[in-house]
Amino acid sequence: YQIFPERFANGNPEISPEGALAWDSSIKPKTSDFFGGDLQGIIDHLDYLQDLGITGLYLCPIFESPSNHKYNTTDYFEIDRHFGDKESFRKLVEQAHQRGMKIMLDAVFNHIGSQSPQWQDVVKNGEQSAYKNWFHIQQFPVTTDNLANKRELPYHAFGFEDYMPKLNTVNPEVKDYLLKVATYWIEEFDIDAW
């Protein structure tokens, strides 16, 4: 059962993003809107999901990110603060397992967020960046200022969106980093799959 956490259920309004909309809003949601869904909201509905016969939960990205969709990750080792924290995630995994449900995380390893430390190092240091080979860069600087056509980005990006630079997954350093991420969540939180 796939869950988009930001829109599933708000179990802890205290951690909702500033300006989060009410759940019963009659507006047509925009891609920039937040409603405050979180991990506690999922925990609160585990009995309901179990009653439906659900045996696995596939969570869209839950990692630190400024967007509502979280596909532009800034830190793969942190839960986004608007979703909760590592202890609330641990609680979700444990309670799901008690109900016979598996937990799968969305492995967004094709690209990373432009606010990630790795990409920001490339922006700041250009060709001298220790991370320049982590990405598919055509030319320096990697600025998008005055860019008339997204297809002319000086680097490859997911969906030509400048805030999601593509990772060079052939690079051994990138592979090692992503394997550390995957291993961390399995070993520390007992997730079942990516």
Protein language model features and the residues they cover:
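Substrate-binding/active-site clefts of carbohydrate-active enzymes
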Residues: 5-55, 62-190
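Phosphate-binding beta-loop-alpha motif at adenosine-nucleotide cofactor sites
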Residues: 192-194
